[in-house]
């Protein structure tokens, strides 16, 4: 939640946390992008928040202890509601592995428990659920950043539910999926409500727990309400960023897209788009024409290309919105076999009826 656009990344998420504080958040968990600015910044974000963070599977390997509490309980309607925080083990690869290492980068000192078969993740989650029960929880809700993309297997929210018992509902993120209500069966055959709001606050999720424990969910896409303090903070920061990055640097006659123009569904993670081509062309041109180096092929993963761009002027902010993560382009010598392996691995979910994969490669050369 502190990444994704220029408004998040220009101050390493500080204003986003300020807005969350003013909005009155009660609890949050960490996703992979909370680590994008380094481990020290991730910990600072937690301290800046007026609300607690929970994660049952972020571990300090030097002590063997969790970095954060696994569970947070709240009283409501005469019952205790527990939230179990779960962070995607993909944080290692979808953030920066070095951030989880010691200063000399000789060994890992932090882990996001996952396991190649998912068992470490499932065990950590089950222990947290059991802990919530011992603390007196009447309702237990998973608060995860796991997603449902096949490329995230075996760490998807659906797999976590299927390999544990005790959840009553699960609020998910990571895959940017719009999912109002899906029933997923846990290891004991109990139906668990799984929900996800999509991305960029296109929806706000509403979960209602009835007196008898029945759970219903709703996705709210529009609301005629505003908080003056939150709106003022947001407007001031938007104006600051627009001023910093507002200089025009180019003009285009066409729309560049990450979403399929025919269906409006995101395509950048499963197939070619003109913006994916353009970004890869830009990397290729940079190395060959700006740095005067011998670059044969350029590759860029679709997960790092984040927004459509309408025809018209391009500013520095446009570039920051397209590629907000501050990734560094690298030039290396590889074999033809390595290139083939990379392309095949990137396209393993593509094709007819393909599934999203942030590692899908866009190429130039």
Language model regions located:
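Acidic, metal/ion-coordinating pockets
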Residues: 1-226, 270, 274-285, 295-298, ...
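Non-catalytic terminal accessory segments
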Residues: 231-365
């Amino acid at each position: 939640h502190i990444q994704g656009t220029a408004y998040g990344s220009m101050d390493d998420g500080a204003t986003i946390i300020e807005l969350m504080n003013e909005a009155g958040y009660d609890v949050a968990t960490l996703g992979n992008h909370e680590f994008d600015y380094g481990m020290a910044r991730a910990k600072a974000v937690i301290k800046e928040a007026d609300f607690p963070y929970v994660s049952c599977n972020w571990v300090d390997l030097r002590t063997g202890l969790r970095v954060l509490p696994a569970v947070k309980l709240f009283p409501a309607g005469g019952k205790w509601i527990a939230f179990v925080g779960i962070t995607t083990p993909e944080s290692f690869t979808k953030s920066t592995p070095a951030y989880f290492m010691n200063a000399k980068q000789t060994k890992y000192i932090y882990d996001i428990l996952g396991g190649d078969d998912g068992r470490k993740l499932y065990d950590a989650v089950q222990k947290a659920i059991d802990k919530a029960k011992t603390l007196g929880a009447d309702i237990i809700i998973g608060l995860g950043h796991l997603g449902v993309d096949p490329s995230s297997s075996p760490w998807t929210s659906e797999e976590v539910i299927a390999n544990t018992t005790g959840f009553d509902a699960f609020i998910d993120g990571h895959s940017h999926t719009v999912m109002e209500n899906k029933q997923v069966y846990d290891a004991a055959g109990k139906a668990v409500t799984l929900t996800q709001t999509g991305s960029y606050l296109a929806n706000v999720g509403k979960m209602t727990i009835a007196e008898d424990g029945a759970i219903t969910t709703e996705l709210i896409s529009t609301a005629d309400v505003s908080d003056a303090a939150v709106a003022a903070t947001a407007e001031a920061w938007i104006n600051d960023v627009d001023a910093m990055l507002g200089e025009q640097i180019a003009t285009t006659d066409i729309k560049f897209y990450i979403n399929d123009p025919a269906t409006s569904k995101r395509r950048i993670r499963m197939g070619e788009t003109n913006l994916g081509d353009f970004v890869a062309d830009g990397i290729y041109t940079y190395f060959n024409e700006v740095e005067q180096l011998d670059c044969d092929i350029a590759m860029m993963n679709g997960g790092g290309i984040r927004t459509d761009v309408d025809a018209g002027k391009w500013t520095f902010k446009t570039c920051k919105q397209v590629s907000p993560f501050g990734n560094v382009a690298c030039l290396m010598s590889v074999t033809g076999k390595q290139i083939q392996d990379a392309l095949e691995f990137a396209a393993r979910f593509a094709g007819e009826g393909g599934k999203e994969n942030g590692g899908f490669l866009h190429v130039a050369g």
